[in-house]
From Swiss-Prot:
It comes from Yersinia pestis. This is Uncharacterized N-acetyltransferase YPO3031/y1452/YP_2654. NCBIfam families: PRK03624.1. GO terms for molecular function: acyltransferase activity, transferring groups other than amino-acyl groups. InterPro entries: Acetyltransferase_YpeA (IPR023072), Acyl_CoA_acyltransferase (IPR016181), GNAT_dom (IPR000182). The lineage of its organism: Bacteria, Pseudomonadati, Pseudomonadota, Gammaproteobacteria, Enterobacterales. Belongs to the acetyltransferase family. YpeA subfamily. Keywords: Acyltransferase, Transferase. Its EC number is 2.3.1.-. It is an enzyme of class 2 (transferase). Pfam families: Acetyltransf_1.
Length: 141
């Protein structure tokens, strides 16, 4: 397995991966999400590759106060082999190198498997409520 920074040629393969991982939602256009990421800290957008095939991804961010992680996904055929742990670990190292004191991760409430994985990596449920407001409405995907 190789973990590397996303490249423009990975575009379609990553979107297909996200489809396999059930990460896509109608209100989020994945092409726009990638384009936005490529314009802001693209070196925090990581992919895991096996024999030239992308099998995992994580899209990280850092605003100078907190880090974030989105689109963590591992192809179903490759789950349980440590790919997600490796992606998060690499992202954590990149964030620490930037002086990031804390990484916040949003997970859907019903995603018990992913919550369990993060708990094994010493992440804890926080007593906060996340609020959001859509500022730009993407075209439905």
């Amino acid at each position: 397995m190789e973990i590397r920074i996303f490249q423009q040629d990975d575009f379609e393969e990553v979107i297909l991966l996200w489809e396999h991982c059930d990460l896509l939602r109608p209100w989020n256009d994945p092409e726009m999400d990638i384009e936005r990421k490529l314009n802001h800290d693209p070196e925090l957008f990581l992919v895991a590759e096996v024999n030239g095939t992308i099998v995992g991804s994580v899209m990280g961010g850092y605003d100078g106060h907190r880090g974030s992680a989105y689109y963590l996904g591992v192809h179903p055929d490759y789950r349980g082999r440590g790919f997600a742990n490796a992606l998060i670990s690499r992202l954590e190292k990149k964030l620490i190198a930037r002086g990031c004191p804390k990484l916040n991760i949003m997970v859907r409430e019903d995603n018990d498997a992913v919550i369990g994985m993060y708990e094994k990596l010493d992440y804890e449920t926080q007593d906060t409520i996340m609020l959001g407001k859509r500022l730009i409405v993407d075209q439905e995907y």
